Amino acid sequence: MDIPALRERAETYFGGLAPTHDWHHVERVVENAETLAGRTDQTVDEDVLLGAAWLHDIGRKRESDGEIADHAEWGAAEARRILETQGVDPATVDAVAHCIRAHRFSNDVEPESREAKLLSDADNLDAIGAVGLARTFAYAGEHGRTLHDPALPPEVDDSPAGETSFNHVHKKLLRIRDRMYTDAGRALAADRHAFLETFVEQFEGEVAGER
């Protein structure tokens, strides 16, 4: 598998995307994946992991533009086509496609392979901690989402993703730590989760005029 060529090809799918899912997000996920792979004592097929990491969000722009419903499903199919043109063997193509299908937080596709679990963890790590908070509030700016509504605390917000940015932190970000699949992922997530908890405490204190 020609990873540098895949990287170049993948980048062509990201023109005009907003910061929450731009090319820099992909680069961070790749860095996370490499870190996690280096901290596991099990054998990892790095071609599968890195190929999937570079390609995992190639369907994002189409989904954002309303052309497709599920960027993970479309991206897996598109990745198959790309890899087949490289002459990659069918088993590896299948493995990469599974990683891409299973990486999405809201999908019901369970990651089965070690590489799929590592990619899922790598992607989820970019949704928590300082970067996760930055992306949450960038999304608020992109879509006009309310920062915080004191009349709608998280415990009475019925939206699965949270109606406000602060509620999104509670509804999604603070739950990601418990969705990690690997020991290495859980270790990194613990530190980022602690940062989120510190932020929530500080935010609530400032909103109440107590800090």
Label each residue range with its predicted role.
Residues 17-23, 31-42, 55, 108-211:
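Divalent metal-dependent phosphate-bond-processing catalytic cores, especially two-metal-ion Mg2+/Mn2+ enzymes
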Residues 46-65, 71, 75, 79, ...:
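His-Asp-centered metal-binding catalytic motifs of divalent-metal-dependent phosphohydrolases/nucleases
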Residues 23-30, 46, 50, 93-101, ...:
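Short, well-structured alpha-helical segments
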Residues 17-49, 71-90:
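Alpha-helical phosphate/pyrophosphate-handling elements in metalloenzyme active cores
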Residues 1-8, 211:
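Terminal disorder- and signal-encoded targeting elements
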